Amino acid sequence: MVQRFQPATLSLEELPPIDYIVISHDHYDHLDMRSVQFFRDKEATFLVPLGIKSHLEYWGVASKNIVELDWWADHEFEGIRFVCTPAQHFSGRTGTNQTTLWASWIVDSPNSKIYFSGDSGYDEHYQKIGDQLGPFDAAFIDSGQYNERWREVHNLPEEAVQAAIDLRAKQMIPIHWAMFELSLHDWDEPIKRSQQAAEELGMELMTPKLGQVVDLSLKNQFSHWWEQVQ
């Protein structure tokens, strides 16, 4: 199995109470059985794309705690609206079983509107989402583990920044770059390229340390912490 760059900042047991969990797709680095079963026992609600409900039910999650949605469908809990939106990726727990949907998500609350890309290559879906459902206070966008040969399923860093612009996001948080090594680039190349592209295109980049708590309502200042990693 692929190893993490470093141990998790917090254990599952140290996390605060979690009410809702969105799942982008069923690849192993995005859908972990042990984590699902931990939150199953906490009665968390899972929001998943089509086909993934069967995984969760097999792992013992009650049907009442699963909301399965197609692209552009939404569901509301306690004033928080969750929208399942398109992504450009693929799925499957094995190399041949690709019968489940992949997705990005919007979490729209009275306090903020957040976009989460899941895994995705760059395409016109970002512009469509921005036009129909934007703007966003912050966008978490796939910015790592890319390669020119598979750019259709993982954004290049420059494309990720352009995606944030297409989405009409006020701020972008690069994700999918500092946990697992799944490509051939240096571990910090994604953030360096994202930083340069953001400066050139005028996008505000948020680069918190792993585990750092961020208040989106504040003007946050972030160090280039990756430059200090040996």
Question: Model-flagged regions — what are they?
Answer:
Residues 48-112, 193-213, 217-220:
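Metallo-beta-lactamase
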Residues 4, 20, 45, 51-54, ...:
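Cap/insert and terminal regions of metallo-dependent hydrolase folds
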Residues 218-230:
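A short C-terminal boundary segment appended to hydrolase-like catalytic domains
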Residues 1-26, 33-37, 48-51, 92, ...:
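Pre-active-site segment of Zn-dependent metallo-hydrolases
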